[in-house]
């Protein structure tokens, strides 16, 4: 009996046979979305994700959004585009934007030593840029090694250059500006301590509390399916912890593409591969993975907790975006994307094959 990875590969092979046999003339958004739905539902079951919410944007507007499975299995609460999830490491893309806002204002240089802001990185020569590009380990700048714990050191950098705590900067400089009214900068705001509550006004705290009620329950994948699980850490850092929905992340995507947060030149800098000290192009830029697939530029990030997972994939030159959120680790945990290849994900592979012919 093949394992889960083998079953996913077999399913993809069979479904790609169907796709390859489809006449090119039948390719359009409605037909493509219908075919993609079949992939998502089949992969959701094999990867043991109880619920998935998904959106596709083309030319700055959502052209398809759907929920699959359940946000709460026992209560049979369906996953919808408005369902909230912990988006895990997709939070890193927000951190990138917050730091580049500081660079634009002149309150930060990416080439400052990270030690000025945090003692968490032991390499004395490591800079903010090194941490942001996952090149701070060993000889800074020499090699890429994805490390979410190190990335969390950027929390204190945002605190300093924005002049306010990370979660408050995230709320005021990104969430509010993009009208992401259902997103919550930290699960701990459901029942905030007095010091956390002091960061936001009463209506905002009430909105956060209401939004958390739509948070999908967490599950962990197991050999025979998925099982209820505890929540991941409830606080937030530069590395992870934002709660959001695909509806709100679609607003974020549109705001990125219309330069609401930072100048286009700054965004393109974030989407440029870092270069090692030996001249090697690395798979990561400033808070984003970057690669080319069949000549098409892809910028992306994945999110991974044992209980939640996520995928955010953009083809900016094609004005095309996919966002997937799930309430187990199944969107990411079986697929080695940390090395820099989004095509290790069958979800991404299906999307690229269908929508980027």
Predicted features by range, described:
Residues 9-19:
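Bacterial N-terminal signal peptides
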Residues 95-96, 150-155, 247-250:
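Well-ordered alpha-helical segments within folded domains of soluble proteins
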């Amino acid at each position: 009996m093949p394992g889960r990875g083998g079953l996913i590969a077999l399913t993809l092979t069979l479904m790609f046979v169907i796709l390859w046999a489809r006449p090119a003339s039948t390719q359009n958004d409605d037909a493509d979305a219908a075919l993609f739905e079949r992939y998502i539902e089949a992969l959701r079951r094999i990867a043991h994700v109880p619920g998935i919410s998904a959106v596709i944007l083309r030319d700055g507007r959502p052209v398809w959004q759907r929920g699959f499975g359940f946000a709460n299995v026992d209560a049979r609460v369906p996953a919808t585009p408005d369902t909230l999830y912990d988006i895990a490491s997709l939070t890193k893309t927000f951190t990138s934007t917050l730091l580049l806002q500081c660079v634009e204002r002149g309150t930060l240089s990416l080439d400052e030593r990270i030690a000025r802001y945090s003692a968490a990185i032991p390499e004395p020569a490591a800079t903010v840029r090194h941490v942001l590009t996952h090149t701070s380990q060993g000889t800074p700048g020499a090699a890429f090694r994805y490390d979410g714990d190190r990335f969390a050191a950027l929390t204190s950098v945002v605190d300093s250059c924005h002049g306010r705590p990370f979660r408050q900067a995230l709320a005021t400089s990104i969430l509010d500006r993009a009208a992401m009214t259902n997103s919550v900068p930290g699960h701990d705001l459901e029942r905030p301590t007095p010091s956390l509550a002091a960061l936001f006004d009463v209506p905002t705290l009430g909105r956060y509390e209401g939004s958390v009620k739509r948070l999908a329950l967490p599950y962990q994948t197991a050999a025979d399916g998925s099982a209820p699980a505890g929540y991941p850490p409830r606080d937030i850092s530069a590395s992870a912890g934002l709660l959001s929905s695909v509806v709100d992340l679609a607003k974020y995507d549109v705001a990125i593409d219309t330069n609401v947060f930072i100048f286009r030149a700054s965004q393109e800098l974030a989407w440029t591969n870092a270069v090692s000290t030996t001249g090697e192009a690395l798979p990561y830029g400033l808070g984003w993975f970057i690669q080319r697939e069949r000549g098409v530029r892809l910028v992306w990030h994945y999110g991974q907790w044992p209980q939640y997972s996520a995928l955010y994939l953009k083809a900016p030159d094609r004005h095309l975006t996919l966002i997937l959120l799930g309430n187990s680790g199944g969107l990411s945990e079986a697929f080695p994307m940390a090395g820099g290849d989004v095509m290790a994900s069958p979800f991404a592979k299906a999307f690229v094959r269908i929508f980027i012919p």
